[in-house]
Amino acid sequence: MKILKIQTLRGPNYWSIQRHQLVVVRLDLEDFQLQRTSFYQNLCKVLPSLAGKDIAQRSDISNATFLAEIVKDIAIALQGYIGMKVDFGTVKPTVENNIYQVVFEYQTEQAGRYAARAAVRICTSILETGTYATNELQEDLKDLRDIRLDGQLGPSTESIVAEAKARNIPWIELGSRAMIQLGYGVHQNRIQATLSNKTGILAVELACDKDGTKQILRDSGVPVPRGTTIRSPKYLEDAIAEVGGFPIVIKPLNGNHGRGITIDVRTVKEALVAFDMAQEVSEEVIIERFHLGRDHRILVINGKFVAVAERVPANVTGDGVSSISQLIEITNKDPRRGDGHDNVLTRIEIDRTSMDILARQGFTLESVPPKGLVCYLKATANLSTGGVSVDRTDEIHPENIWLAERVARIIGLDIAGIDMVTEDISKPVRQVDGAIVEVNAAPGFRMHTAPSIGKPRNVAAPVIEMLFPPDAPTRIPIVAITGTNGKTTTTRLIAHIFKQTGKRVGFTTTDGIYIGECLVEKGDTTGPHSAQVILRDPTVEVAVLETARGGLLRSGMGFDGSDVGVVMNVQADHLGIGDIDTIDDLARLKSVVVRTTLPTGYAVLNAEDPLVVAMAKEVESKVAYFSMNPDSPLIKSHIADGGLAAVYEEGYLTILKGDWKMRIEEAVNVPVTLGGRAAFNIQNSLAASLAAFSQHVTIEQIRQGLATFVASSEQTPGRMNLFELGKFHALVDYAHNPAGFKAIADFIQKWEGEAIGVIGAPGDRRDEDIIELGQLAANMFGQIFIKEDKDLRGRAPRVVADLLRQGVQEINPNIPCITILDEAEAISAALDSAPQSSLVVVFPDKVDAAIAIIEARKSKLS
């Protein structure tokens, strides 16, 4: 078997609305020999966790489906072995023999992709040899763990993201530095670990300057250790005398995670060693008085005390039998311990500091300490070096709370970790000769959310409440538009209408990403990346997002839901691409847009398309319908129940809600309808008006938007762009499927002169679809020029042109039909041949180039 393609989805998708993170594998099972029972027995020897999922006896599935299911189960199991909680998966046969789509959940994208490849390797090996080498499986699991560590969010970030998700606040991971955006557009905030966009850079700089922090706190009357800073060991003895003599603490001026710190230094010899260790981290070294006591981390968020944890340095307790080395090994087997931030605790690693600390206690790694004796292994109590935490939130004295809150305000940190050394946190720090020894920006949350002893504290909630106070918005209005035809025009029209409200609108279309009036990126930008460009922009107040089939298939939706989901229609286009082989498959794919519409929002549906109407049964939002037929039974029933609709009634675009009716504008006064002749643009205008109205845009603002939106190369490039060229006209439209051709045919019928067509077709369409375009063209035009796209999409030259010609000749073998493969030459030839009062209709591949040719011709007339 072999993998043909691996895709990773990152949002609501064809396979699942709730499970956003999915791997989709297109798998060719090829020829295989299979004895199910023995294969399954061998598989369970390699992966015992699959033993309870005995599908070998299922008679309702073929051997091929069985193997595809096994690959899925292996991929899920591999991730489970390394602690990733994934359980969703499914398989689907394609129309091609023995080719399947295998779908399963992931937590870390690269781990999911690795699991897919490993699952195929394991399955193939068991098919061919009956086993899979243990060392290879262990290597796979090691690689997966490494990938997971590299790709997962840290525990502090994860806790904040989890709290945001619990409050239905959307989030986006920005770049590769664990920066997270919470909220969309103009309402966003950002965090990086426990730094936020509200964290002042001066406060962070001050907190990183340990000596400067201590000086400011001392000057403010805060109890801090006496200390000084030196750069050379020749000043060491003077510095020790200055702080009051031994015992002392030696630490780097700019350090973190306990690196380079030595505590309870009692001799000059020890001090020299400690100085060298500190200078490996920072050129400047702090010498300060050592306060005897326990290490406590007090967390202050937005000026308020949140939690306190006692931190205990990494240690082992003697059992009278085992060596310290063995005790460390036993301790590291605790399932709560992992590498780095992989788990709630970190494995203890022995380094030079550990050896020195053991030596000061009279031990080596081979020593066997007496039963019950605690042997410390680190100088500091950081969890990242193997320490443990004990929650003391309910024990701290009110005066210590007041002091910690004051310290956070003095330094200026919105999120501060304040280290207090005291024998008893329940007593005022001044009474027990304690001190504030450090103030930390970006404090870790793990010691509070998952203490080794005591009650876990939800310290992420105050962060979210600081960033988003009560009633503060986290989302901007999102309108998502999908369908086979009319998406781009409707998207642009909705965006234009929203601009009448005075808000900054970001929108994506098949011709580019726009914010306000500015083009951000040119191209076919209707996928999830383009949507996130808009949602990440801190100036955008409304997002209008064209959401096309291709992006949904490749990556899923780029956002978790919309306020309005619009489905224009579902027509037979792109069938056979991406294993979407039937129109029902296509409808299911496009329904993702409305199945994710928020319960408070609206699904705006085409009442004239049965496939679209059927989507109403699957949505959680309210439903609104649009129709060219004011007498539609569905519309009448819907508004009788108090529903919202838009219809074309007596020449007017009209909004209906229950017994209420409001005429927006007469269609002939809406420029995009070309005087009411472009029926499909009347329909597009209904959908746009309804979407805007559902979001409280006023009728007057909608009317103003409709009146100022023109089917031009500036506002709707490639969509019903009509040019006057002296004695004749030219029309440029990006119609590229049967439904699009039929819509243009309806417009042509109202044209008094002859119609000439310049036609082409995308090469990735089925032969029968291309032939149908030729057949339709034969009924539309009196003369036809056939051209080909520059990108043939896998076809040989002339194949598409010949299929189009075949379709034309099947309907009318006598129609003048000229093949000119180059698009520019074909357009020029058609323009040259145009008689008086005729209409040259161009269906371009390259819209801008086609418009440029016509504009150049027009400029010569003036």
State where each predicted segment sits:
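Conserved N-proximal alpha/beta basic substrate-recognition cap immediately N-terminal to
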Residues: 99, 103-238, 242, 256
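Adenine nucleotide phosphate-binding catalytic loops in nucleotide-utilizing enzymes
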Residues: 580-587, 591, 601, 621-742
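Active-site nucleotide/adenylate-binding loops and adjacent lid/helix of ATP-dependent enzymes
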Residues: 186-352, 398
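ATP-dependent carboxylate-amine ligase
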Residues: 3-63, 492, 579, 678, ...
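Flexible active-site lid/hinge loop adjacent to a nucleotide/diphosphate
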Residues: 515, 519-626, 630-634, 669-671, ...
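Walker A (P-loop) phosphate-binding motif
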Residues: 194, 469-512
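ATP-dependent carboxylate activation and anion-phosphoryl transfer catalytic cores
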Residues: 1-166, 304-307, 312-326, 353, ...
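Residue-level signal for inorganic ion chemistry
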Residues: 164, 419, 508, 546, ...
